[in-house]
Each structure stands twice: as structure tokens, then as C-alpha cells.
């Protein structure tokens, strides 16, 4: 099968670029002092410490967003080039953390979240090569918790470093330790923190399977390590569970009827488990018959119901979970008529409706709204390419993979686009966000962070109290203008 038939997924994604992007080696990092006129992040608002944000659903609680956009879009605060990677960063404590690759080094870079000024970096060697010709950089977003940053590289190296200065605290080579056969696009499921545990999608295999090539992936079996939990402070193994292989959806954690649950959309279907022990409640088979297929959209949990979706075959299903099992509320029928077929971009639930990009390819993707409890299609809008969403203040910030940024009203009545813009460099008129722009936008303390193939752009989505438009800053990842 040609690689063009398999759009790269990360989720995690999510978040992507093309091989050869970025800089082989940036200049030696030099901190930059900023004048007082440069925008600073508002004291109000929330951090965005992990993939899909603090509530794990790509929804922001911040309000007062700019809805009347000028022709050039919301004000650009700062921007910088990126290395090779697919993921968007994370924001905590006034710092922005970005995970990229430069040459043969995977690198975490810490920047001032409001100015883009370089603070420090941490790196480690990597020789990962993608089977399908997509880029060789990280797919996962950094996870920040309790003064630590967790990194999960494309080759399966798991690192924990200090969020203050990048010093190494512990590391585990999950591919070597658990016998992971390289997946279609490498490792792309961002870990999650649960109490004292770091829960990681691993999906290892017994020794007799480890020489299988990518064309024999259906012959690869699990060794019971679909879900692996480590002590988040020490890196010690706490448990391994699940007879499944890894895919690209991020584990989802939720409280259902007073009990903590974990949901992992693995290669062959959805696993419901107890996150503190790894005890498995159920496995719901849900995978396309296509050999080169993945499950990449993170499960969406509302009350005691869990929504899953994929784009290669069966489509979507809604389950009602209970200890030891589940009931199917609805699922897409066989054939072509599917409610939602999200690829890597996780849909967002809002007031009884689900909004997301449905479609396997750029050309056939639609932005859709469906009814949560029935799957009924409320509206669809073509031509937006595969898009990623962020909910804030009654609207969706919608980033198409072609780099087009839109503001869409969150309503089931019809598609209502309030603004549409292609962000451009003021001096060259070149697009700031080049295709593919596969990472979902993030919002933290009024600042909107977006990435395209090789550039990170920070916008002021929520105006400062004084309403003053701040000057642009164009930086490199080492902090130089």
C-alpha cells in the first residue's frame, strides 16, 4: 500500500509536519531580554499542561475571546520556527514546552509562554526512521505535572525531566523493555498522569513477534502490555495490563458513578480499565479490516457514556459503561452512511452535540455536528480539509490542515463561520502556517498557540485589559529574533 493512502497520525497528535522540516541545528541558545512593551500572559486564565488541556477534552474555560477578527486575524504576539515534529506544546507556570527533533537529537525546548524567549533545553539522541516516509520527529505533546515534564519519543523512549531546568530525573526505553514492534507511524500516544501514576500506551509483543516487518503487523501479538503504569516520581513499574497493541489515541480518564475509569482506544478496540490497578473491565472490538489502519481519536466521555470514532472502516460507536461491561447505545451501521469518521482529530462534546472533522482524506473531509445520544447528523460543511478544534467561549477555533484558521459558532442549528483568515508574515506575505497543520490549537491565559509544518505562532485571542495591540516578535527556538 502506498504511504499516500495513510495520512500520518499523532495525536496526539496530534500534530504533525513533513520530513526535512525545521533546522538541522539551531544556534547556541542565548536568552533574550524583552522590553516592557512586549505582551505578557494575563494572570487570569488557565494552564494547558497536557494533550487536550487540563480537562482532557480540548475545551477551554477562558472567556472574552476576540470574535470580530480583523482581516489579518487576531494579533500575532510572537512566532518561531520549529524542528521536526508533529505535536503542539504545553503551557504551565508561564512556560511553553515544545518537543521536536534536530538532526539526531530529540529535544525539549522551554520558552517564555508570553514572549517566546528561550529559557533552556533538554535533548537525547535518536535514530528513529518512519516506515512510511513521514517525518522522524516526536508525535506526542509534553506532559507537565508537579514540577516534572514527561516526554514520549517516536522510538518509545520515555523521559522525565525537571520542569524548572530540564535536568533528567528518570528514563525508560519502553521499546526495549517491553518488546515493542515498531508501529505504522512509531509511538504517538501521549501519556497521562493519574495520581501517583504515569499511564502509558506501550503495546509490546513476545520475542517471536519482534522481527515482524510493517507488512506483517497483523501477525504481531500482545504480551499483556497495552497499558503500562509507572510511578511518576521514580519511573518504577507499577503494573502492565491489556492484551492489545498500541495505536494513536491517548488514554482517557474519567469518574463514572463515583469510580475512576480509564479508556484506551487501542489497535483492536476500546479497553475499559481501572487506572489505579490496571484491572480490565471490558474490551469492545472496533477496528477496520484494512491492514494499515489505526485508531487515533481519543475517546470522549460524558457521564457514563463513551464515544469512539475512527476513519478506516466501522466509524463511530457510543457505549454506556458499567463495572465489568458495557451496553451499546448506538453504533454506525455497515456501509457508507456513518455519523462521524474522525481520523486523528478528537471531536468535542458541547451541550448534547458532538462536533468534529469527519473524513479519511483531505479532499473528502467535512466538519460535522451530530447528536450525542443518537448519532443523528445535524449539519456538515465540506471544503475545510481535515480540521482540528478548540472550544472556547461559545465558539470553536478551527484549524484546517491547509493552515486556514476559522472561528465557528458552537451551535447545532447550522454551520456559522464568524471569521476566516490565513495568517501571513507581514514583510513577505508568506503563510505563517504551512501544510500540514495537524495539531489542535491550545489556549492558555488569553494566548492562542498554533503550529503548522515548521512554525509555531502565538496569537492574542483574549484582549488585554487595556485593549492595546502588542508588537509582533519573530524568534528562533533559541530565543533570537
Residue ranges and their predicted role:
Residues 1-4:
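Positively charged n-region of N-terminal signal peptides that target proteins for export
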Amino acid at each position: 500500500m502506498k504511504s499516500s493512502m495513510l495520512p500520518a497520525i499523532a495525536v496526539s497528535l496530534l500534530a504533525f509536519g513533513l520530513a526535512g522540516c525545521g533546522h538541522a541545528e539551531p544556534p547556541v541558545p542565548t536568552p533574550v531580554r524583552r522590553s516592557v512593551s512586549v505582551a505578557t500572559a494575563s494572570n487570569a486564565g488557565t494552564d494547558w499542561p497536557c494533550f487536550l488541556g487540563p480537562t482532557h477534552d480540548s475545551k477551554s474555560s477562558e472567556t472574552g475571546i476576540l470574535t470580530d477578527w480583523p482581516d489579518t486575524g487576531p494579533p500575532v504576539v510572537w512566532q518561531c520556527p520549529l524542528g521536526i515534529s508533529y505535536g503542539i506544546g504545553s503551557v504551565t507556570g508561564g512556560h511553553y514546552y515544545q518537543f521536536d527533533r534536530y538532526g539526531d537529537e530529540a529535544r525539549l525546548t522551554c520558552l517564555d509562554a508570553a514572549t517566546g524567549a528561550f529559557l533552556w533545553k533538554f535533548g537525547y539522541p535518536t535514530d528513529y526512521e518512519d516506515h512510511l516516509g513521514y517525518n522522524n520527529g516526536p508525535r506526542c505533546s509534553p506532559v507537565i505535572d508537579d514540577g516534572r515534564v514527561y516526554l514520549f519519543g517516536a522510538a518509545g523512549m520515555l523521559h522525565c525531566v525537571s520542569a524548572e531546568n530540564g535536568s533528567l530525573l528518570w528514563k525508560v526505553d519502553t521499546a526495549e523493555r517491553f518488546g515493542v514492534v515498531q508501529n505504522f507511524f512509531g509511538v504517538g500516544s501521549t501519556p497521562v498522569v493519574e495520581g501517583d501514576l504515569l499511564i502509558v500506551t506501550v503495546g509490546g509483543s513476545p520475542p517471536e513477534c519482534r522481527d515482524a516487518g510493517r507488512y506483517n503487523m497483523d501477525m504481531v501479538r500482545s504480551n499483556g502490555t497495552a497499558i503500562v503504569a509507572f510511578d511518576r516520581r521514580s519511573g518504577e513499574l507499577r503494573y502492565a495490563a491489556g492484551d492489545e497493541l498500541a495505536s494513536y489515541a491517548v488514554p482517557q480518564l474519567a469518574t463514572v458513578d463515583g469510580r475512576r475509569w480509564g479508556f484506551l482506544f487501542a489497535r483492536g478496540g476500546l479497553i475499559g480499565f481501572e487506572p489505579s490497578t490496571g484491572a480490565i473491565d471490558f474490551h469492545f472490538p472496533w477496528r477496520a479490516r484494512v491492514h494499515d489502519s489505526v485508531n487515533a481519536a481519543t475517546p470522549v466521555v460524558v457521564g457514563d457514556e463513551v464515544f469512539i470514532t475512527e476513519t478506516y472502516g466501522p466509524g463511530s460507536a457510543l457505549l454506556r459503561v458499567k463495572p465489568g461491561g458495557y451496553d451499546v447505545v448506538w453504533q454506525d451501521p455497515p456501509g457508507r452512511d456513518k455519523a462521524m469518521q474522525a481520523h486523528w482529530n478528537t471531536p468535542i462534546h458541547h451541550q448534547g452535540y458532538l462536533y468534529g472533522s469527519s473524513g479519511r482524506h483531505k479532499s473528502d473531509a467535512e466538519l460535522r455536528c451530530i447528536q450525542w445520544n443518537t448519532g443523528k447528523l445535524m449539519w456538515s460543511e465540506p471544503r475545510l480539509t481535515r480540521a482540528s478544534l478548540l472550544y472556547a467561549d461559545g465558539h470553536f477555533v478551527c484549524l484546517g490542515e491547509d493552515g486556514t484558521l476559522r472561528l465557528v459558532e458552537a451551535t447545532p442549528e447550522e454551520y456559522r463561520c464568524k471569521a476566516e483568515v490565513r495568517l501571513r508574515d507581514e514583510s513577505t506575505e508568506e503563510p505563517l502556517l504551512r501544510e500540514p497543520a495537524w495539531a489542535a490549537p491550545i489556549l492558555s491565559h488569553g494566548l492562542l498557540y498554533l503550529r503548522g509544518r515548521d512554525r509555531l505562532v502565538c496569537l492574542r485571542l483574549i484582549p488585554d485589559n487595556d485593549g492595546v495591540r502588542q508588537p509582533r516578535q519573530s524568534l528562533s527556538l533559541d530565543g533570537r529574533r
